[in-house]
């Protein structure tokens, strides 16, 4: 098969980016051709990745490429621009179009609650050859749009293999981890919806109980400078490491090493990092968004006291890690099966 993945391509290594790259690498390892088209403003030079500078350039590229499947990856809000792109792809002859919809919070949003057959969104979605929902709530929404069951799959957006515990961590992270116990980790984009300021403030409470505790914040985004200022203003600034973006393999190794993964959010869907941590057997403390998988310690939104209490309880419990037994690739195999079964 010849496939093109369309969506945000790393960096940064957010959840959608991670899933897109995982599918691409899996397909290439299994003898398929898979390029990628980056859809945001960042311009890079990754091999096999196209970086169109405008909608016109993107349209010309899609017309020119001779492929079997166009696989779109949408997260966040569903804009008219994205809807138009999906419609355009369905009009191209000789190609199948698949959409992975990653925005777990969209079904409960005002726009998501208006899902219906007679909407423009419904018209476009019914034209797609395949739709991948990353959770059951999204799948139910697409059924309201009229997507036929034989074209709809629920496939979790993560794939992970156990990292080698002997793999060295970057010196800066290794030094920080060696100096702090418990070692707490948060992984995600540095954006307002991830409520990272709450974690920084909660470290004051956590340090009262665990004086050597440390928090590493991994990711990139628009709040980087303001978070640096917030951290620098704290008397415990040396206990927080704003690391920056990190390659996925290193991130998984850090997840394996940490005492707990924190996922505080104001708005969130089905988090890839949460799924990865659960697969590795790493304890996870996350804001309750109504759609978290089993096995997490849930806390209310923006609740500093409950976050501190949860860290204390999880660290004090010290339960043994229980990684999952499968190879972590079933979700990628499910995507490949969907490609083969497209009508």
What spans do the regions from the language model cover?
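Short hydrophobic beta-strand element within catalytic cores of glycosyltransferases
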Residues: 279, 283-286
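Conserved donor-binding/catalytic core segment of Leloir-type glycosyltransferases
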Residues: 4, 172-194, 200-203
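Donor nucleotide-sugar binding/catalytic pocket of nucleotide-sugar-dependent glycosyltransferases
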Residues: 122, 126-167, 269
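A charged, aromatic-enriched C-terminal amphipathic alpha-helix characteristic of glycosyltransferases
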Residues: 316-343
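Aromatic "clamp/platform" in nucleotide-sugar-dependent glycosyltransferases that forms part
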Residues: 266
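Short alpha-helical donor nucleotide-sugar binding micro-motif in glycosyltransferases
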Residues: 245-246, 253-258
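Nucleotide-activated donor-binding/catalytic signature segment of Leloir-type glycosyltransferases, i.e.
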Residues: 228-246
């Amino acid at each position: 098969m010849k496939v093109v993945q369309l969506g945000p391509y790393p960096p940064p290594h957010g959840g959608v980016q991670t899933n897109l790259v995982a599918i691409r690498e899996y397909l290439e390892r299994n003898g398929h051709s898979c390029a990628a088209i980056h859809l945001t403003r960042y311009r890079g030079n990754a091999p096999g990745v196209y970086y169109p500078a405008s909608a016109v350039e993107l349209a010309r590229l899609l017309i020119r490429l001779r492929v079997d499947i166009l696989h779109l990856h949408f997260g966040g809000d569903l804009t008219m621009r994205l809807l138009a792109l999906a419609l355009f792809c369905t009009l191209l002859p000789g190609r199948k179009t698949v959409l992975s919809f990653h925005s777990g919070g969209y079904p409960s949003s005002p726009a998501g609650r208006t899902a219906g057959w007679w909407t423009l969104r419904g018209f476009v979605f019914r034209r797609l050859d395949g739709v991948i929902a990353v959770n059951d709530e999204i799948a139910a929404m697409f059924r309201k749009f009229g997507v036929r069951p034989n074209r709809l799959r629920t496939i979790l957006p993560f794939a992970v293999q156990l990292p080698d515990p002997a793999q060295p961590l970057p010196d800066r992270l290794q030094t920080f981890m060696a100096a702090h116990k418990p070692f707490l980790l948060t992984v995600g984009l540095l954006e307002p919806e991830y409520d990272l300021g709450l974690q920084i403030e909660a470290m004051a409470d956590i340090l009262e109980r665990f004086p050597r505790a440390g928090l590493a914040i991994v990711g990139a985004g628009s709040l980087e400078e303001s978070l640096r200022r917030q951290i620098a203003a704290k008397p415990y600034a040396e206990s927080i490491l704003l690391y920056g973006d990190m390659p996925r393999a290193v991130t998984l190794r850090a997840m394996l090493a940490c005492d707990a993964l924190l996922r505080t959010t104001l708005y969130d869907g089905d988090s890839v990092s949460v799924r990865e941590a659960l697969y590795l057997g790493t304890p996870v403390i996350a804001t309750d968004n109504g759609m978290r998988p089993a096995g997490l310690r849930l806390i209310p939104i923006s609740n500093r006291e409950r976050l501190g209490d949860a860290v204390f309880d999880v660290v004090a419990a010290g339960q043994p890690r229980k990684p999952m037994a499968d190879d972590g690739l079933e979700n990628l195999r499910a995507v490949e099966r969907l490609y083969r079964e497209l009508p």
